Amino acid sequence: MKFSHALLLASSLAFFACGGDDDDSPTGANSRYDCSVTGGVKVVYPTISEQFKIGQEITVVFGTDIEDNGYKIVFKKNASDMGVDLLEEAYDAVMDGKTCNEVKVKLDAKRGVEPTLTGIIRVAPYNKQNKGNNSELFIVKE
């Protein structure tokens, strides 16, 4: 009887130790985020009050149902900033209105990313900019 209790305890501890929920990246975005959207773009990551550093690579997660030839990922230092494109070329997204697209981008000072308390990622169809959408506000430090 004691052996079975010890075995049960050990297996429970192993289950929790292998969880992976402590990871900061949005791995398995379809299961962690609701990317469902109708008639536009929905940016689900980064979320509000996230903190990043200049030079850090982050994963932008978004859903869309707007058919286009690609998507722009733009960093804005505040709501009124025009922003800087973080990609060399347009991103080819899955546009079914339910899939979470994950795009790795670098917050690179060489591209114009600056420290800010009001950073925004804007994801927009390349040819239909008015259908784009912004992330929540986040922080970028030196």
PLM features: residue spans?
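C-terminal motif of bacterial Sec signal peptides marking the signal peptidase cleavage site
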Residues: 15-17
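Extended, solvent-exposed regions of the mature portions of secreted/cell-surface glycoproteins
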Residues: 21-142
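Residue-level signal for mature regions of secreted extracellular proteins and peptides
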Residues: 11-12, 28
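Sec-dependent signal peptide recognition
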Residues: 2-9
